[in-house]
Amino acid sequence: MLRRFLKGAGIKYTLGLTATPLKLQTNMGQDGRPFSKLVMLTSRSKKGIFFKKIIYVAQIQEMVESKFWSKLEYQSYDFNTGDLVYNTTGAEYSNSSIKKAYKNQKISSKIVKKVEELYDRRSILIAVPSIDEAKALTTLIPSCKAVYSDMPSQERKETLEEFKSGRLRCVAQVNILSVGFDYPELDCIITGRPTASLSWWYQFVGRVTRIHPNKSEGLVIDFVGAVPKFGKVEDI
């Protein structure tokens, strides 16, 4: 559709901008099993390449040094990956194994204890594997509410308004605020959701990279081995 529009309008040159030049693409192997690989923007389309060449790349470290991104600090803790198994796509761990690892390694208790220590943080966004786990945290952490996909839209809207206004300190979320949630004043994220996806890790850390006069840096708390697995996003 885009190609037809550009051709009909007589547009010869198109400039594309993206914050995520790398994406996971799932393909079928010769053995009949699906596999996933990271592909670049210029080569990832299954319908043919639209963008032909990358003409400029702004490295994340460059963005931090230029103060377009907030400075980041990391705290990463030991995590045993023994319970984790890949799902059928090979792109992510299975939901059941993610929940098993979360439970067996008592990540919920670790999150609660860490939040108690973070008395100097104004707002904390927490990623957990399931709705039940998110709701459980709301009973253990003061000023904490859960956000998930099938909650009433008005309730979700009001919860996020509370969070952004500072009336609510913590939000435990399940795969809904990891991408595209814009709250520049957010100064801390906690990941309690194991992941095999570099894209998810990059996007979630991105929630705390916005600059704001009221914060000096964004704090990333990692309970699931994401930093050892993927590294700091500034180094990607």
Please state what every model-predicted region is.
Residues 11, 120-122, 167-168:
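Short, high-confidence coil segments that cap the C-terminus of an alpha-helix
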Residues 52-125:
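Conserved interdomain linker/interface between the two RecA-like ATPase lobes of SF2 helicase motors
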Residues 67, 170-190, 197-199, 204-213:
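SF2 helicase motor core recognition
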